[in-house]
Amino acid sequence: MAHIEKQAGELQEKLIAVNRVSKTVKGGRIFSFTALTVVGDGNGRVGFGYGKAREVPAAIQKAMEKARRNMMNVALNSGTLQHPVKGAHTGSRVFMQPASEGTGIIAGGAMXXXXXXXXXXXXXXXAYGSTNPINVVRATIDALANMKSPEMVAAKLGKSVADILG
């Protein structure tokens, strides 16, 4: 696994995994490369991309472009999550919960990169089941998408934020 951080404007780009795959044909093997990347603006927007190409730089470039196109907003609460949240994708399940300030990101591999790109500075996260980086990133993005801010819940229920927070 390679970890590369670049700054494109205000976006943080993180390379999570590069994989060599081969296709066997009559004349031998054809090698190509896949790249998994996460992009975030450090202000609650995050996206991931998966690119394939015959060369590593081209695969990374394609993955970064897809990640920039697939960005979504995440409602954070002063550098941590709003509430404990679960996410799943195929065999990977992710549980993420808020942590007090100064805790840092307690997460493994692909989850740490996705949480850091979304600017969640303090969160505890655990992955269950498959630890395939692609599925873990998709499950993490699913969990972040399922997270609701008190304002969103109050608007949905037609109550005030004070009523929701108790």
UniProtKB/Swiss-Prot annotation:
Q: Where is the S5 DRBM domain?
A: 11-74
Keywords annotated in UniProt: Ribonucleoprotein, Ribosomal protein, RNA-binding, rRNA-binding
Superkingdom: Bacteria
What's any GO biological process attached to this entry? translation
Drop me one GO molecular function for this one: structural constituent of ribosome
Gene Ontology cellular component terms for the protein in this record = small ribosomal subunit
> Which N-terminal residues, if any, form the signal peptide?
none
Q: Tell me the Pfam families matching this sequence.
A: Ribosomal_S5, Ribosomal_S5_C
Q: What is known of its domains?
A: The N-terminal domain interacts with the head of the 30S subunit; the C-terminal domain interacts with the body and contacts protein S4. The interaction surface between S4 and S5 is involved in control of translational fidelity.
Q: What else is known?
A: Fifteen X have been added to this sequence so that it corresponds better to orthologs from other subspecies of Buchnera aphidicola.
Family label: Belongs to the universal ribosomal protein uS5 family.
Entry-linked HAMAP family: Ribosomal_uS5_B (MF_01307_B)
Function description:
With S4 and S12 plays an important role in translational accuracy.
- NCBIfam families registered for this protein in UniProt: rpsE_bact
Subunit-structure text? Part of the 30S ribosomal subunit. Contacts proteins S4 and S8.
Q: What is this protein called?
A: Small ribosomal subunit protein uS5
Which taxonomic lineage does the organism of this UniProt entry have?
A: Bacteria, Pseudomonadati, Pseudomonadota, Gammaproteobacteria, Enterobacterales
Q: Which gene encodes it?
A: rpsE
